[in-house]
Amino acid sequence: MNKNKESLHLSSPAINTHMNKRSQIWAAFRSAFPYTIPIFAGFLFLGIAYGIFMHSLGFSAIYPIIMSFMIFAGSMEFVAANFLLGAFNPMNALFLTLMVNARHLFYGISMLDKYRGTGKKKLYLIFGMCDESFSINYTANVPANVDKGWFMFFVTLLNHLYWVAGAAIGGIFGSYVKFNTEGLDFVMTALFIVIFIEQWMKEKKHYSALTGLGLSVASLILFGGNQFIIPAMLAILGVLTVLRKPLEKAEVSV
């Protein structure tokens, strides 16, 4: 009897540790989910549009489902659909993918500190990073009692699942849709406008936002609508790196 009591007593710390870990994971999920609700609306509509688009090209539902799960890069998935219809040209696909998604290089640099200490979750966080997940994970004020690694993991996972679900719905039920889906992609543009406004409202002074906006407009004028993103991000990264300390002092002094 005493041995049983001793074994229960010895195992209780392990049980408590397991329960604490589960509660931490659940708390991170509950904190992350509300942030992803706007993404759910955008990804669902855009994912459905992508699934319908793939169906219109003659692909079965399995194609948008697998591509949305494995690629998870909205704009490139639309481009990849056309690659599947043309001659096999892997180098062209490689360079076009790098050009379209080169902004992720800057996302990765920005998230180096935030991803530090996340353990094995880092691999999925890197794979699943998209514009929307980056925006949330970089700007969200995570509560002190919530594990930031699990918070970022669930933000990334939920956004990924939303996109796959939308693509699956569009691919499966695409043959039943008879309305014109042109313009559905504007949902994501509207979403980024909302994210920008929220970030603007959080800042006491808007130096960084105005810098990003001004440099983006200048790059758009100089390089045109198809090639302005990379120059704009390089300019923003350089200017904000040089002015980082003055900007931080200005924010603190307010």
From Swiss-Prot:
What domain of life does the UniProt record list for this protein's source?
Answer: Bacteria
Q: What is its main location?
A: membrane
Q: Which GO terms describe its cellular component?
A: plasma membrane
Claim: NADP is one of the keywords in the record: no
A Pfam family that the UniProt record links to this protein: AzlC
Transmembrane stretches, start-end = 33-53, 65-85, 153-173, 177-197, 220-240
From the UniProt annotation, give the residues forming the signal peptide.
none
Cystine bridges: which residues? Answer: none
The membrane topology term of the UniProt record is: Multi-pass membrane protein
Transmembrane: is it a keyword of this entry? yes
Compartments it resides in: Cell membrane
**GO BP terms in the entry:** L-valine transmembrane transport
Annotated family: Belongs to the AzlC family.
Q: What does this protein do?
A: Involved in branched-chain amino acid transport.
Its protein name is Branched-chain amino acid transport protein AzlC
Specify the species. Bacillus subtilis (strain 168)
